Amino acid sequence: VYNHDMSPLLPSRCGIVVRLLAITLCACRPLAAQQVVLPPGFGPPAALGTRPSPVFDAARSALAAGATSRALELARDDYASCLRIGGQRWIDSIAASAMIGECHYELGDLREAVAAYEESLLLAAAYPQWLLAVQFSEQPPRPRQSPPRATWGRTARNTRPAQLPDTVAIRQAGADPRQVMEQGGVLVAPFDQLIRPAEIMRSIVIAIYRQGMILGPLGREAAPLERAAVALAQRPAQPAHYAQAWIDVALGTALWAQGKPDQARPLLTRGLVIGEGLDHQLTAWGLIVLGRIALDAGQAAQAVTYAEEATYAAADELDPRAIEEAFAMVLEAHAAAGGRGVPPAIRGAVAWAERDWPVLHARLVAMQAECLATGGDARAAAAALKEIDGRLLRADPGRGLLGAEAAYAEAILGYARADVRAGDAALATAIEISRPRSPRLFQTTRLVELVVQGSGALSDRQAEALFAELLAPPADGDFAARPLDTLAVISSDRQDAFETWLAVATRRGADQAFEAGEALVRDRWLSARPLGGRRLAIDRLLAADPARLDAAAAARRAALLGNRRDLAATLDGFAVVRGRLAADLLAAKQPPADGPLAGSADDWGKYQALATTRTAYVAALSAGREATAIDFPPLLPAPEIRRRLAPKQLILSFRWTRTGLTAALESRDRHATWEVRQAAGIPVEVAQLAKSLCLFDPDAAISTDKLAASGWRDSAAQLERMLFENSRVTLAEGIDELVIVPDGWLWYVPFELLPITSDEAGGGPLLRDRCRVRYAPTRSLAVAAIPRLVASGPIGIHVGRLTRGPKAVVAETLDRLTQGIDRAVPLPVPDKPPAAVVASVFDGLAVLDDLGGIGSATATLVPGASARGGITLSDWLAPPQKRPGFILLPGMQSALARGLEKGSLPPRPGDDLFMPALDLLAAGSHTALLARWRVGGRTTTDLMLEFVRDASLAAADTPPPPASASWRRAVDVVTAEAPDPDREPRLKQGEQVLPDARHPFFWAGYLLLDCAAER
């Protein structure tokens, strides 16, 4: 074979003859059909050396040494020098492409890696019969005489490595004379070429394995994999030859990657040995794939065995790619099996790898350090981490898998030392390194691209199923086996993928769209929470009453505490001290809000110390491999949501999509969906409603004349027409309670103001007149039925600038609330202990202060006496889990308070209400009252007083009415009275005297969230 790329590699004398002959022959024929006919012996490919070449080996060695970028350069050089037959690459490019893929894989460029692996597989499929042309020795395989290389253990499989020739000749046929005559090209005689067939087969297996790991379910029907599998299924090797074992391993790996583990397992098992119990070059990879099958089947203990056996086989073959993969699987399977401590194989291999395998050694040390820190041996873990060569961490490996594993071990060590700040910083680094290397994130991105591009390879049914699989909440075992990848996935912004899923699901059916939309909203909130909501989920689980948990959650909680007696003791002590402090606060009877804390200083010191210890435990558990579910917000199937609805209880939900606005009304036995035709006009009409309600300045006083003359009913009627004109539903009758799940701009709409019929002139009944109304951030939370707290502790009341007047008025307001509400006491807001820790003692919380917008985590929830005091929303979400079953924030503001002017809107309209709504429910409350705009004054105080009176009656034998009924009653009672302009900071007396406070400015800004179980 000869081509111009090879000419520098030919002997000069031979090259001159060949070139002269080529010129002579070409001159004798038209240029359109140039041919070169070489007699046997000219341009022998043997002059090019063995394939894969030594450059291939150099690239692999560079990878093992940590010089990843240099390895990629070498792999590309090797690829450029690979043989060609005409314009077609030869089989040595199979190995070269796979090596390029390995380099990109280590560098975290999964897209380029997949492209290289796919080329490798397509080349393998293009030469399906090449093994038949290999001139293998007729000698049967013999056992290798050298001792096993692994020092950390011995195989239990009763096998020995085989002594097989590395290099053999392959008979390559010459070019087809007829094809050369018709199409032009080079005509050569048959020739022999030295190759390393095991290396090529190993490259095929690696390419298939990586495709399976990187693409997962997305690659099961990929064309390159399918073509390679078809070629391997022909079993293109001599019968009864040991090359058949290579085919078994390769074909078994392909079947596994195609999602056919039952077909793969027997082939892989048979392909592990040749002859009389001899391992071969692909045995390690066969064991690795069997380990993957065992892990996928939940057989973690068996996977540990396969992985350990793979380390022995890989060491015997000096296969650095297999041995790194095998040891990574040892730890993964060990953790998935619930193993404790350092796996013996990892502990024993550290010294073995130190001299010749720098990257492997560093990765093993990082794994060992993680296990030691998890087990509580912080000193040994710190000593282990110091063994990692800093030069590696500053080079390519430090930006790759090694860097992620070392940073993760550093994080676990930080948490073991109760240094949460250091742990969080190291964990953030580990996640940042892991994110571009996450197969799940790559699969998700690729699926979105396929759908958006309109790929014919996927039907809507297939795409919807893949989205449901890839975007599903992590399974319990995901954290145990792959904590970093799982944390990287759940903390990433995947809204584009969820939006695409929703678009596909909408074409599939109503329930599919319901569930995709529910998952989208849930992820929008979770991805903005620390560690994708995992830290909060663990804190909620630890704080929960085991008697009120379902069986699965109770078992997870018991497992968390089973091996952590210190944590169990911390939780018990925390509850005991909190009980004493709650009793002390109640017994103090009206302590001054800014005076000394009721209760002993010793108890408050213990409480803060226990809270700090608990916080460190929660941080460590959330970063670790504990098998826990993220169960808030709940994610229920659409039929289950409807099943939980009571008779005459309905859910009205909305969802903004890329194409518009979808609405749905669901009852226990039916549902209706429709597209809002004038969706583009909704923001304009909501802004018009705000204007009609005199909302333009969040602090300005509104004249009674303006309120009396406002035309809010017309705006509300127009909104009602726009939202329901394309539906066949009516809200006029047959509804006891309506649960509204807004989205986007509709969070700013007080649905209570919508008219229930368009037949009457202004002044007809409103939605609130016909049914109880409450809101929920998600449809699942609308029926979540969170158990009510049996209230017996204090209810904290904080009064600040929400009322007009001097301190005496503030004191009077505080006194009215504490006297009018059972167990109400002023909420202390000290600097020490932290105010959020103090507030966690209370059973309920009402904050009557000017809070502004609380859409961000750093926004103030409860103002403090000093600049550093108070409680932020992130404080409230942080451990320890807060106790208040209800929280009232009438001093909150949203963008609606400024009339929805552009500068006031969050990046996604409505998030200034949606995010804090979920935050407050997640922190432990089952009921929350937010404000779209602040009113303040006597009316606000009376509304809160009347509402909380019902909520505070939640004793074991006297359950309160539903929150929506309590709120409706409070509005009816309070707004029937005339407002006093002297006690209303947002009201200015004009010529018009308001006979009552029924104008929606006074009450419609409040948004009641409730998901408490009705006993």
Regions found by a protein language model. Give the residues of each.
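Residue register of alpha-helical TPR repeats
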Residues: 53, 95, 246, 285-287, ...
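Amphipathic alpha-helical segments of tetratricopeptide repeats
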Residues: 76-84, 119-123, 128-129, 229-236, ...
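Amphipathic alpha-helical protein-protein interaction segments
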Residues: 405, 420-428, 432-435, 439-449, ...
